[in-house]
Amino acid sequence: MNKLTFIALLIPLLASCGSVSLSQSDRDYVQTHPAPKAFDSKRTEYTCATWTPPSPPDAESHLWYRAATLIHAEGWRKNTRQAQDMITLYEAAASKGHYQAINNLYLLYTNGQGASGTLYAPQPSRARKWLHYGLDKNWAMANYWLFDALYESNAGYRYNPKLALAYLQKAVDLGVPLAQYELARIYDKRFKDYNTRELLLDCAARQGFSAAMDELSRIKRIRYGNLKESLQLMHNALRYGGEGGGEAALKLTMVYAKNKALMDKFIAIPADPVREAAYAELEKALKGTGTKSGNPFYTFPRLDEVLPLSPAKTHWKGIYSAMSKEDAAFYQNPPDTAALAADILKRGIVKKEEVYWSPRPPEPPEDDGL
């Protein structure tokens, strides 16, 4: 499960910000706050609550965040200097209360990261600091982070699956789409309750969560034979980008190919070389190739204008034509991430020694007994 890709693409809206106390890493939230209502595995009714995430506190912090995502999208292809610049940019944005930056830092610090063959070990105390910051701000998403911490023994928390599921269900009731998606998977795999699974997937899909749309598309196609709705869900998933959007683009490429391959249920749809090529371009943009990284942070809000579903006429002019004008300008003329990170350190917005992430020491050679 790649939580990082899913969470990083939630669209931020309204927010407040504030200073961060380093003492937040020293507390244990579950010992100082009452536990939420116990998880009910027999519950089958959910109201599809929605959540409006915090918006960027200012333009500068949002620029730092967006610059960090340019490096983040490189994955293992970024070098060690870029990896540190990314953390500097995220930490600077987070210091102003930028929700998306804090979200990505929590996940980086819990999972670790890699760059050019170099591994960076998890940083539990840093993850804990940002987890507690979100909880203190009453961010609904922070309940999902606490679920993750308790369920995966992250951020210095002890494994407590019962309490973890209680926080997951609380996050669902507060409208967090990733939590809705995660709980849908639990109803599917653990309880074999497919109806509740679909209800929760629909809740997340309504909020633009691409992984939920892609999964719901598969269900509509296979379980119900509803090809029209399945096709629309794939198209919608692509609009919102992310891992689900990349998977949807791959499937749509097959839908409009002469040889439908895995999407042979759509045999009645005529081959369309223009759409096939456009969806292939979008898939590479999101997922990358064997030699180039994709960018799961891309979104395509103008997709219906330039690449509507058939039989409508297309106006495709490449991936930037499907982006917002602001995004197209940003990605075609990206900022100098190294210069931004250096300026942050020069201005003392964050201190180098406080954000430096040392690489994991190399593994000792194996003793072959000779």
Language model feature labels by segment:
Residues 2-8:
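Sec-dependent signal peptide recognition
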Residues 17-85, 370:
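N-terminal leader/linker segments that initiate helical-solenoid repeat arrays
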Residues 18, 305-370:
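Long C-terminal extensions of eukaryotic subunits of large macromolecular complexes
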Residues 57-64, 71-75, 95-100, 105, ...:
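Short helix-capping/linker turns of helical repeat alpha-solenoids
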Residues 79-88, 117-130, 156-167, 190-200, ...:
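Structural signature of tandem alpha-helical TPR/SEL1-like repeats
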Residues 92-93, 132-134, 170-171, 202-204, ...:
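Canonical positions in the second alpha-helix
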Residues 203, 231-243, 253-261, 266-290:
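TPR/TPR-like (Sel1-like) alpha-helical repeat modules
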